[in-house]
Swiss-Prot record:
PANTHER family: INNER MEMBRANE PROTEIN YHJD, UPF0761 MEMBRANE PROTEIN YIHY
Species this chain originates from: Yersinia pseudotuberculosis serotype O:1b (strain IP 31758)
Superkingdom per UniProt: Bacteria
Keywords: Cell inner membrane, Cell membrane, Membrane, Transmembrane, Transmembrane helix
Protein name: UPF0761 membrane protein YpsIP31758_0030
Length: 294
């Protein structure tokens, strides 16, 4: 009787256990930590070129001049915890130095920035086991569109938001408190939408929208928790500052970028595993329904 009760208690957890096993097997087989390390290395190599290209695009549009300053502050405050101010100062110096580069050097910066997008594309298609390859021209067009239209769309959305916030009817106390709550969860929403687009658009196979939304939500929540946990770790255990001194920002930045890519790839693995788990359950049900006839 006790064993029967235990079975009834554990039976609702069985799907979760099965899914967890499938997810762990997939993560282990794909070598998630190695893929994250590869992307972290490429990200650090491409970070300055990518930021240079993005803010050069903002500089080309006068309407984005003020927004680019706000966007910088928003990115470093919400996506680079603990050492955002220091990293921002260094990156702004690097970007200022890159403005004196020649045409050949500028082309090299653009190619290096595109290298990061290509690496993300390759890694995600490895996770999805996709053998379909885009043509070189189509791939370049997609990468260039992401590199150029992405920042412009973000800037346009911030321009619209700033305009709406400046309207007089929003000065009401209740509306102000509502806006504060929305702004508090805004980084989470941006992460969720960004991850959803990443998991939906980048793979060369069809990805169910529901699976991509679930995987993106898990990744966004882990990313927000990771920011707080990482900031707490740097504050409470300042071992990097004690060992490296002024240069501590380098390993701290690398560690954060690596941790971020682990979260992004975990969300991708969850998205893929959801589809595989559903297919396996469908196959098991079809076998059970066919067995009495045999």
């Amino acid at each position: 009787m006790a064993s029967f009760r235990r079975f009834r208690l554990l039976s609702p957890l069985k799907p979760c256990v099965t899914f967890g096993r499938m997810l762990y097997t997939r993560i282990d087989k794909d070598g998630l930590t190695m893929l994250a390390g590869h992307l972290a290395y490429v990200s650090l190599l491409s970070l300055v070129p990518l930021i240079t290209v993005i803010f050069a695009l903002f500089a080309a549009f006068p309407m984005f001049a003020e927004i680019s300053i706000k966007l910088k502050a928003f990115i470093f405050a919400n996506f680079m915890p603990a050492t955002g101010d220091i990293i921002q100062n260094y990156l702004e110096q690097f970007v200022a130095n890159s403005n004196r580069m020649t045409v050949v050097g500028t082309c090299g910066l653009i190619v290096t920035a595109l290298l990061l997008i290509y690496s993300v594309d390759s890694v995600l298609n490895i996770i999805w086991r996709s053998k379909i390859q885009r043509s070189l021209v189509f791939s370049f067009a997609v990468y260039w569109m992401v590199l150029t239209l992405g920042p412009i769309l973000v800037g346009a959305s911030m321009v619209i938001s700033s305009y709406l916030l400046s309207l007089h009817w929003l000065a009401h106390a209740r509306v102000d408190s509502m806006i504060d709550e929305i702004l508090r969860v805004f980084p989470l929403l941006i992460s969720w939408v960004s991850f959803w687009l990443l998991y939906s658009v980048v793979p060369t196979v069809r990805v169910p929208a529901r699976d991509a939304l679930i995987g993106a939500l898990v990744a966004a929540l882990l990313f927000e928790l990771g920011k707080k946990g990482f900031a707490m770790y740097i504050t409470l255990f300042p071992s990097y500052q004690l060992i490296y001194g002024v240069l501590a920002v380098i390993p701290i930045l690398f560690l954060w970028v690596y941790w971020s890519w682990c979260i992004v790839l975990l969300g991708a693995e969850i998205t893929v595993t959801l589809g595989e788990y559903r297919a396996e359950r469908h196959h098991a049900k079809s076998v059970i329904t066919q067995s009495p006839e045999m």
